[in-house]
Amino acid sequence: VTSVYYQQLQKLKVTPLPEIGSLALFSLAADLIPGSAGISGESVTDGVKRLQGKLKSLLAARLVKLTLNATSARLSVAAAMETVDGGQLVAESFTVRGAKSGSFSQNRGVRGLTSNAQKIKQGTQVQFLVQNNELVPLYITVLLISVDGTLCVLSPLLGRGDNSPVTPGEKIQIPDPNRGERYKFKVEGETGIAEVLVITTTTPLTKAVELLQVLAAERGDSLRGTPVDLTQPDEAIFSLLDDLDEGSRGSGTNSLPGVRQIDTRQMAAMSITFEVVGM
């Protein structure tokens, strides 16, 4: 972080400001990644060690986003984000077939919604809606990529060991107390862009769920049914990709040794982004 860049951050009113001479991570657009700056004078070796967790989290998020296939997925699914106070839709995402079956905005007569939400003030309580328009049950996984790049599981949380699929025609909300999700999703933390990824599959994500069960058990009963931060995000995402690969191989697609593949007939991944702003 140079003195010139520090002055630029001051003009942009970025908080907290990093120390001049500190090591930090930046996006391709030269934007500071929140929470990545260290202390002034830190060695490159120490900086790399300190940032290993965040680098893994950013890599995991990137790998998941590479699976986004709303335009090519053959499943009919729709997802949306709404405020709890007033139930206002602020963003939605859907597959091509999901749009034909009726998106949330179409059903409510709302126009102009995209997968990019309006600016959401800190402290706003929101929830996410997912509609299964298929004739078969679907398994739903919802991940949050926070402003600082941390990867967090919003659903399933397996508070009661439940990983039941969403039945045909069913709409669920997240968080949902009936699914063991005992939390309220309030937009908090640092300002910036956050993203929610909704992954739907026709087969259960066995390996990923097993890892979530281990993480949930380690946290104890007091945190049961609350979002799970992935302390080893690369391991979690590789488990997820393995599940998607196994589901694809079981669908009769031609497989290549050593190459993970995803069958768009078996899964769909959608993205909803929103900007966290100050109150």
Predicted features and spans:
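Secretory-pathway glycoprotein ectodomains that are cysteine- and/or Ser/Thr/Pro-rich
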Residues: 1-279
